[in-house]
Amino acid sequence: MDTSQDIVIADSNTTDNVEVRSISPRVAAIFDDIYYFFYKEIDIEFTRYTDNKLISERMYGKRIDFFISILYITRNIIESYNNVELLKCFFKMLNHCSKPNENIENFLMKLFTYLHSDSILDNIEIIRALRDNKLKIRRETQDYLNQILDKFYKKPKEAEERDGDDGLPMEFVRQDTLSKLFREIYNDIRDLLPEPIQVRHLLSRNIDGTFKLKEVLFYEFDRVSEDHWFYDDGKQSNIYSPEEINNNTNNKNSVLLDANDKNENNNNNNDDADDAAADDADDADDDDMDDESDSNNNNKNSNNKNSNNKNSNENNKNKRTKSSSKSPQLPGLWTDEECRSLIKAVMIIGHRWIKIKEDYYSTSKRKPSQLKDKMRSLRKRYGDIKNIAIAYFTKAEIIEIEKLAVLFQQKEEAQKLAKEKIDSLSNIKSTSNTSAASGHNKGKNENNDSDEEVDQDSDNDSNNEDNQNESESENEDENDNNEKEKEKRNKKNSAVPPAPAPPKKLKPIEEEESDEEHNDSEEDSQEDSEENEYIIKQKRKSNQIKSSPKKLKTNQSVDKSEDVNQSHKSKLKSKPQRKVEKEESEKEESEEEESEEEEEEDDEDYESEEDKKKKKSKKTPSNQTSTHTTTTTTTTRKSNTKPIVVSSEEDSSDEEEKRRTKTLSKKSNQTPTTPTKKPSQTPTTPTKKSNQTPTTPTKKPSQTPITPTKKPNQTPTTPTKKSSQTPITPTKKSTNRPKSIEEEENEQEEQHEKNQNKPLKKRVSEDWSNSSDKTSNKRFKSPETLNKDSKENKKTISNSRRK
């Protein structure tokens, strides 16, 4: 037979003359095999976006694996294939594959051998289209197909050997009439071939017109064959049609149960055969046994066999009944109307499957779980609800559904408000009932105290009816005891009025505890109330004095705030202490008057020396000034005391004395505040008077030489000037007798010698030389001349006093 008669090549011009015929189920099944093996069954996963991140393109994972089953496709298709258009569709499918497998090569080699005839291979349309690049496929697939063609041309001998007598492979069965049917399939389904629903941007097509694989999000598959479901047992050999498989689960279970039943029956038969063989062996070994024993054994074995067969049959029946009861047959496939109603319900109501079942599927046999599963499958296929709605509804229908959803939400909100109002009214009624019940209980217990009525009501409400009598008796006893205690308290309060409470601001935590204890004692002891009040006040004063922080201010002068603190502390002192301080102050005033008579005449020299001392005192550390503060007293009038200075140019004439008195009067008005800035005047509590060791006022400067290096401003002309740094303690002067003039002179000489022996001579001389106060009218003397002048001053003082 000539190949031209058998092979009918359909040209593109003959499409119009083809009669429109219904697609046979066999042809549809063949096409579905190709379609689902390439797109559905093997789970071709195109690149998609999740959370705005592009998933890296897999190396076609299962798409490479599906070529293993290409031989199964050839067994169903290539033997009946005779159309170029279906080959073009197949090549378009290959256009989505990046790395074809060896099985593809074998498939194409068989295909070319099928198309090969004596000399017409070049005239075939598919080959011509491949060479001219007329097929809308990628260049990579074109190059791949050209490579296979080159291989085929290089091996013509093998192709000729494979050809039969007719020049065609013997394994292929030619069916010329199917060419027209395949053309009908292509014309009917080519518009339903996979096209992307969503593309990242418009420039996502290749030059050939195909879509770029990386730009495609997901594909929309045809609805003609989407209801087909294929069961894969791992080997991809068993493909079941939708009629055989009902919603996946029941059919799987039934198939598995049938297989289990077969396995169990086989096992039982094997067990029976083993038992029979064992029995035969036993009979052969026991030939010498009695006939009775043999007959008994045979009867037992036969009984065991029958029992085993019965048990196996019963088990199989029970399993089948259980499977039928657990997995009843579900309704058939989903129709478009059911899918539309499900999508509409989800858009209006939301994911409330029970309500959707009641409102939209009340008459059908579908369950809420099935509705949920169907919606999940639609989401996997289309994506969001919007895309699902676009696939099943028009724009006008979608707008109407959205309006219905808004109305449904408004109704639900109104229902919620009505429920809230009803709940609030019910709560008000319940509270009114409870208040009425509590008022009834209060009327019974009016005779009891007001403090215990709430407790009794709560107890009466909570207790059971059996324990009410016991609770009432206990409450009566408690009421009697409380009444007695109140009567006692009223009597005590009427007899003795309570002491006024002190201010809370001055009370520390310790005092509050002591006050509470003391208040308890006042209730017991009525007669001693006045004494206790006096004791409490003294305790508060002492605690306030102790709690006040003791801070010794160093490197600073006494401020006005310290004077206020001293006055506040002096008020807190007891009466005998105040009397002693008054005597001390009077004695100090008398001594100050005597010292003022012996001050210097020139005010400028005195002020310049004081300024120097102030500058040096600011530089001295706190540890050095603290030694002086320990010997001071807590009197406010000491701030106005002036240092005793012996004038070096005093004469015995009366004129000089008059002039001196005038200067003193002026000086008292000019410099009353300067001595307040000395660091030695910092006050302390009167408890430190024990540290004052000297007995006479002239020997007090002996305390200060503890830190001799920090007093460079001391001039040798005024040896008694140090007495200003340490205040006088007049308390011990009352016991001493008045000293004579000679004794005072001797003491001054001793003190002067001590001061001269100090290591400050060099620093004093330097201060004299480097002093900035050279503009004064007074001529400064050197230390040597001052020593001479001091002796002369002593004589003049003695002469003046004698006169």
From Swiss-Prot:
Residues 271-294, 448-480, 510-533, 586-609 have a biased composition (Acidic residues). Keywords: Coiled coil. It comes from the Eukaryota. Residues 237-333, 429-803 are annotated as: Disordered. Residues 429-438 have a biased composition (Polar residues). Residues 258-323, 400-429, 463-496, 573-616 form a coiled coil. Residues 295-315, 625-636, 666-733 have a biased composition (Low complexity). Residues 332-379 form the Myb-like domain. Residues 537-553, 568-577 have a biased composition (Basic residues). Residues 786-795 have a biased composition (Basic and acidic residues). The keyword Cytoplasm does not apply. PANTHER family: MYND-TYPE DOMAIN-CONTAINING PROTEIN (PTHR16148:SF14), NF-KAPPA-B-REPRESSING FACTOR-RELATED (PTHR16148). This is Myb-like protein V. It comes from Dictyostelium discoideum (Social amoeba).
